Design a protein with these regions (language model features):
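Extended catalytic cores of very large enzyme megasubunits
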Residues: 1-261
Length: 261
């Protein structure tokens, strides 16, 4: 069947119709109704409403969770997915669509995070089901740095908040094999990551980035002070990863050696 024939059978709702029914659903709470409409109700690519109340959203999610439940139907160690379940997960009764909907209904027992409510089972948007993701360590090369930058752009496009750690990048002044001879250091690449965060926006909302560095990294002092210049790294929050070794040195008023790697 042609794609356009499928689309013609999909019900759409007017804004006023959805507003009226969602206000009734939330027992007169207009703020709750408008929040649900703006953030979580499924819409098509022309911004037409495809869901009229949270019940329809909950059925959409229940259908997708039930689909995943069926993957574990064969309760056997020969099932590759089975071994990743907890003991409870291996032994519990499988849930069907109706039972899952019961847990979602009226937001009584389970309220998923926002990205799940807006994105799960929604074919009209490209989005992640995780609100936040921590990327693996950055490979210490230009290729590795640009790869991480590309990952950031793709994740921000999908409305994820992202955390990265730059401790694997060599400190300023160390020898490198390129024409420059020495590296500008880990902190110098923060601006690139920050700019990507600001530039990739969804619905007027920029991405969210956390950059961390180990307290033992030789560039840590530069990292700490980089945002004293209010024009620098404006698209990211920054934090130091403290170690027991450092905290013991503080407690004992002893020396602490910076090092890389």
């Amino acid at each position: 069947m042609p794609r356009n024939a499928v689309n013609k059978s999909i019900n759409t709702y007017s804004y006023d119709e959805v507003l009226k029914k969602s206000i009734a659903y939330f027992q007169g709470d207009e703020l709750a109704a408008s929040t649900w409409m703006n953030k979580y109700a499924m819409k098509d690519k022309k911004n037409n409403f495809l869901e009229c109340t949270p019940d329809e959203m909950h059925w959409r999610m229940a259908k997708q969770f039930a689909r995943k439940e069926k993957e574990y139907k064969l309760k056997s160690h020969s099932n590759a997915s089975f071994k990743y379940l907890s003991k409870y997960g291996q032994e519990r009764e499988l849930l069907d669509e109706k039972k899952i909907f019961h847990y979602f209904k009226n937001f009584k027992y389970i309220i998923p995070q926002g990205s799940v409510m807006s994105s799960l089972g929604n074919p009209n948007i490209i989005a992640s089901l995780s609100n936040c993701i921590v990327l693996p360590e950055i490979y210490d090369s230009y290729g590795g740095i640009f790869h991480t930058d590309q990952q950031l752009a793709q994740l921000f496009k999908r409305r994820c908040g992202v955390g990265i750690d730059i401790s694997t990048l060599r400190p300023a002044g160390m020898l490198v094999s390129n024409a420059a001879g020495t590296t500008t250091g880990a902190v110098s690449f923060m601006e690139r990551f920050s700019n990507t965060t600001r530039e990739v926006a969804q619905n007027g909302r920029r991405g969210a980035l956390m950059i961390t560095i180990d307290i033992a990294h030789p560039d840590v002092e530069q990292f700490i002070t980089v945002k004293q210049d209010l024009s620098k790294v404006t698209g990211a929050n920054i934090s130091i990863r403290l170690s027991d070794e450092f905290m013991n040195a503080v407690a004992n008023d002893s020396n602490f050696t910076l090092r890389w790697p």
